[in-house]
Amino acid sequence: MKVRRNIDLKNQKISVEWISFIKPIGKSPRSRKSVAGEHFSKDFYRQDLKNGLISSYTRFKPVTDCMFITAEPGSFIYTSKTDDDEVCGIFFLAGPDQKVEINFLTFDIPCEHRGLISVVDGWELNGEVFPSEMDHRLPLKQRSSEFCGKNIGAKRSFTSSQNAAVIRYRIPKPGKGFTLFAKFLKNPRPCNVLAASVDEPYTLRNYGRRINCTYVALYPGTVHVIALGVGVSNFLGATRTTETGTLRKCDESSPHDQVIIGGSDGLDTSKVQIVDSICGIDSKPDYRELVEYGVTSVRLVSSGFYENSVTVQVQPLKNELLDANLSI
C-alpha cells in the first residue's frame, strides 16, 4: 500500500512517500478513531498538577489512526475506546538535522489488561529498525523502552539519536491512554537520516569520525550525486586539491572510505543489495543510479582518516521507468 502525505514542517512543504505498513505484534493494523479526553477517568486530568502542563486537553492533537505519522512537534493525546489488543504506533519524523524528544505527561496503561507502551529510538518497518544495529552506537535492546501502569504529574522522557522515533502501544481497555509532548531538537552532527523530502538534497558527513552514516528513503529512487568528497582531507589538515572524478567499485579498491548506493525490501542496512560504490573527489559529478527496491539507501563508510562528505538527492522512481527496467 502506498500512502502519500504532504506535511508542512516549519513553513517548508515536505512530500513524503510511505510504501508499506508497519508490521505489528499480533493483529494487523487498521485505521480507527479515538475520542480525545471524554472517556478518561477524572483523575487523569486532575487540576492539582503543579507543572501546569495539563490545565486543559483541548490543545492536544488526538491520535486518530492506528498508524499515525506526523512531522510536527506538539502535544498529543490517545484514548482507547475498545478492548482490542492490536498494536498501533505513532511515528515521528523530524527534519534531517533534528532529534525527537518525547515527554509522556500522563499515562494510564493497565498492566493487568496486557497494556504496554514501547518507545523505539529509530524507525520501524516490517519488523526491522533504522538505523540498524551495525550503524548505531547502542544495541537494539538498549534503544527501546517498555512500560505500563499509571503516572500522573511526573514526566517520562526519551530522546532519539536521529530524526525518527516510534511509539508502539497496546491498550485493550476503553478510557485508558496517554498524553505526550514531542519536541524537535537540534542535532549538531546528524549521521543516520530518514528522508523527509523527495526534492531537497542532503549532505552526509562523517565530521572526521570513524563512523558509518546512512541516508534512507522509503521508496524506489533515482540517486543523484551532486557533490562527492571522500578522501578530501585527513585529520592533520592535509588537503587534496586535485579532483579525481567519481571513482566506481570502491568496495573493492577503497573499502574503508566509500559511498555505498543500494536498496533493500526493509530497513536493515546489513541486508542492502549494493548497486554501486563510489569514492573520490568530484565537485560536479554527472552521476545517477536507479535503485529498484522498496527502500533506497546511501551509506557513507568512513575510516576516520578523512573528512568525508557526499551530497545526494533521492527522487522517487517513476512508475513507467521502474516497469521498463524490471521488464529488461
Model regions and ranges:
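Domain-level representation of secreted and single-pass membrane ectodomains enriched
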Residues: 1-328
